[in-house]
């Protein structure tokens, strides 16, 4: 499964790797995943939201076991209730499909994400307000974040 995902992701960029290289990539990826942390700036923002009783949710693509482990390592349970986590493999829709956003009935939401393709396009197509964490300095195409 994981080997297929990296092969499919690279194919989007017209790059192909064999199974041995995909497995090597996945092995290194797993090792690096053990050390992920939430930045102090993000912790401060999440604390501020929580202290002001502003709901926080997560919409994420990927296999549930992998995503839940990542959220556990990031200690997201300090800020996000389990019922406010929407994982594509569980709910049956993936970003940027607006259906995954439409599962959240409270439309007074602002979506924050770092992927233009998945987060900005998905949120805007679901008629959500959206903040793009554009860490790579990419240029927005047709759909603009708020």
Regions found by a protein language model. Give the residues of each.
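A metal-dependent, Asp-based hydrolase signature
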Residues: 1-26
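Short, acidic loop-to-helix structural element flanking the phosphoryl-transfer center
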Residues: 3, 19, 30-57
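Alpha-helical elements of Rossmann-like donor-binding domains used by nucleotide-donor carbohydrate transfer enzymes
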Residues: 4-8, 28, 44, 99, ...
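Alpha-helix C-capping/helix-to-loop hinge sites
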Residues: 9-13, 32, 88
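Helix-turn-helix-type domain boundary/helix-start signal
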Residues: 15-16, 36, 94
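Asp-based, Mg2+/Mn2+-dependent phosphohydrolase catalytic module
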Residues: 47, 63-146
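Conserved phosphate-coupling serine/threonine residues in phosphotransfer and NTP-handling enzymes
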Residues: 60
């Amino acid at each position: 499964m994981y080997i297929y995902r990296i092969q499919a992701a690279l194919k989007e960029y017209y790059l192909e790797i064999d199974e041995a290289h995909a497995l090597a990539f996945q092995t290194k990826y797993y090792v690096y995943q053990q050390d992920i942390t939430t930045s102090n700036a993000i912790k401060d923002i999440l604390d501020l939201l929580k202290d002001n009783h502003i709901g926080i949710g997560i919409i994420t693509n990927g296999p549930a076991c992998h995503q839940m482990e990542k959220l556990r390592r990031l200690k997201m349970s300090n800020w996000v209730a389990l019922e406010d986590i929407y994982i594509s493999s569980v709910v049956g829709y993936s970003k940027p499909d607006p259906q995954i956003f439409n599962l959240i009935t409270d439309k007074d939401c602002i979506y924050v994400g770092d992927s233009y393709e998945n987060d900005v396009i998905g949120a805007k197509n679901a008629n959500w307000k959206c903040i793009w964490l554009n860490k790579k300095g990419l240029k927005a195409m047709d759909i603009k974040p708020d």
